[in-house]
């Protein structure tokens, strides 16, 4: 009975490992084939970019009115401390947003309400949205801060501008003067800015970091202390993924629930890695392998791999330093992929030169007696241990006189 249960558990582990291998390969293929539009990002789907949106000013100046670009230019943020009602005009100069003492309201009949739901400009606005219709206001917030995506202040072209294609390694102002008109009472206020192409860094140093970490994990996993090594690697992968996640949270204005949902894969990876570490610390390497594989898939493929474009883009959606963010992404990829391979190969990684390090059982030279726990030496097989003669004692082989 116990043998059948053990056999079933082995089959279950084998199935989990094979399934994990399929998921790992599929995730790598999808990640390598995904373009920027297909890549995942924390919060509201913002991905790394080489386009920087700048807000240059408000004309005329209005005390208490602040407008800034956030989410690496994907959204505009308006803070109204004027005590008056500020109306943001849409693409056809219709009332779109209204920010005042009573909160933030959105005109549900404005075409901008539909168009701004996506960062890609829609080909056609459906019926029901009419710039000439009487505004139908719906309150969306009780504060005096409005955040919205505005196509006028965001590069939404399907390709790079001609000037960028000619010299992509240099900075270029690709949109010199975007404008978003607003109304404050009877006054018209213009918020203006520009969009600049900023070339990104070379991704190869970060690729090298990931590859070196993969090699280091596999090499260290071949030692006699495989359980301890895998536990440390899993813990480091959780730490680097946590740094990446915290940076993305700090750089996104998305609501808490949205961010929790977007990072569910990372949270799952942390929990599963914790289970694997607990088993490894008890020396249960074989039972920890499926958990290591699943944790690596969640952390490396679902967490870090979709943000690989950040390695080669200048504008990174993170509240942390871009270099630290890129390092966290590359490290999570390297540690996670190395951990997945180590979990898949298991005993096949045991390198004799490393597994036989001094202090291990396999390092004992042949013929050397091993020391048991009680301090006594065991006799090597094939040899007889001779007891030393006592000084002055009679010899058994000596004939009696």
What is the predicted role of each segment?
Residues 196-209, 323-328:
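Juxtamembrane/start-of-transmembrane alpha-helix segments at the extracytoplasmic/lumenal side
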Residues 201-258:
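Core alpha-helical transmembrane segments of integral membrane proteins
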Residues 1-42, 399-400:
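Hydrophobic secretory-pathway targeting helix
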Residues 12-23, 206-211, 226-236, 264-268, ...:
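Alpha-helical transmembrane segments
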Residues 247-401:
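Generic detector of multi-pass transmembrane helix bundles and their immediately adjacent loops
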Residues 23-35, 245, 279, 307, ...:
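Short hydrophobic alpha-helical membrane-anchoring segments
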Residues 35-199:
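Soluble extramembrane regions of membrane proteins in the secretory/endomembrane system
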